[in-house]
Amino acid sequence: MSHDLDLWSSPSTPQRLWSVRKRDRELAAELLTLGEYGCEIQLFRDRGFYSSKRFETVDRALRSAERIVRALQAEGWTRST
């Protein structure tokens, strides 16, 4: 017997893209794929949720995350992963 709940798909497990440190602060980015709804970049500050943005494609999300980390590195943040 099929249930309506069987049709519900949950997001994938987030994939860590990078983390950066500056003094005692940490910022991290994760990629969350949402199936037919695209994907999302989630930012965490000191291990707490900070912000997210949804994208139509993984490629666009990855390019955005790379721009963010490059800008942070230009401001003195050090990449740790």
Language-model features: locations:
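Short aromatic-glycine-(Arg/Gly/Cys) micro-motifs in beta-strand/loop hairpins
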Residues: 26-50
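Short, surface-exposed linear segments at secondary-structure transitions and domain or protein termini
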Residues: 37-40, 59-68
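Short arginine-rich
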Residues: 66-79
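Negatively charged, low-complexity tracts enriched in Asp/Glu with abundant Ser/Thr
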Residues: 1-26, 46-51, 56-58, 62-63, ...
